[in-house]
Amino acid sequence: CGVDVTFTKAPERAVGLGQNSAEILLLLGLEDKMAGTAFWPSKVLPELAEANAKVKLLTVEFPTFEAILSENPDFVAAALPSLIGPDSKVAKREDFTKLEIPTYLSPSTCLEKKGDTDLYGARDKLWSMDSLYQEIDELSQIFDVADRGQALIADFKAREAALRASVPASDEKLSYVFWFSSQSPSADAYLGGKNGASGYIADVLGGVNAIDTEAEWPALGWESIIASNPSVIVVASLDRNRWELDKPEAKIAFLTSDPATSQMPAVKNNAIVVMDGQAMNPTIRTIYGAEQVAEQLKARGLIK
């Protein structure tokens, strides 16, 4: 994110802050070079469970700066600015720099704030997997395993191409709402913005995001969401258990029982699908999420 970082040797005690950073390091086979991880919205990928068990979990939520330092890290890779950005309550990059600990922030999340309403930043163009490929490539170079990075990128590119090829072109594009979570049924809903990972998923499936805002995580009332009239509602499954509506079954129960939302065509047509919430962040999980949604929509005949 505009910061130059130089390495004279590969890190030996890396801390992965945020699920995406941790899972990329694990996919690169670097569990023996990791001192700890923190901030996991959902469970680790099943194929990484064994490797992940070898790495200390600091917390599934935001860690403290002291907890990170107690692991004596020689490198910190972060998935989100909220973990090491200028407004982070955990630590700022300069806090690590003062201690001569190099840091890396995911290029997918280098966002600008465009006003007080864009709490999590905004994007003026659609996110693509290219940012993720850059991250995998750069992390693999930092750890001197560039060949593993290229193999992983090739695998993701093949999956993306296969997914696009599996969805036939149609004149009628499905429109999607991606509901991450809400503090309560009466509170505004946190949604995936049109140019973030959710917008990418809609695009790769030949559709569009019904929420037309550049904000990364717009919080909207249900009146506005109902007015957007999506063809499909994608509800996030989260393992963090911060709010009751983190659970997909709680979201579905609300959508089908509330007098207003139950009248939405998407609800009446049973066009509610469940997706791993981490896929709504621009991460390696995004392609998994797109595959999840495609499978459910095909099973219901909503895409051929």
Spell out what each predicted region is.
Residues 1-23, 125, 138-179, 298-304:
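Bacterial Sec-exported substrate-binding components of ABC uptake systems
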Residues 2, 55-66, 214-222:
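Short helix-initiation/N-cap motifs at beta->coil->alpha
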Residues 16-86:
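A short, structured surface patch at a secondary-structure boundary
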Residues 20-23, 40-43, 63, 75-76, ...:
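Solvent-exposed loop/turn segments at secondary-structure junctions
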Residues 123-135, 234-304:
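Structured C-terminal subdomain patch of bacterial secreted/periplasmic proteins
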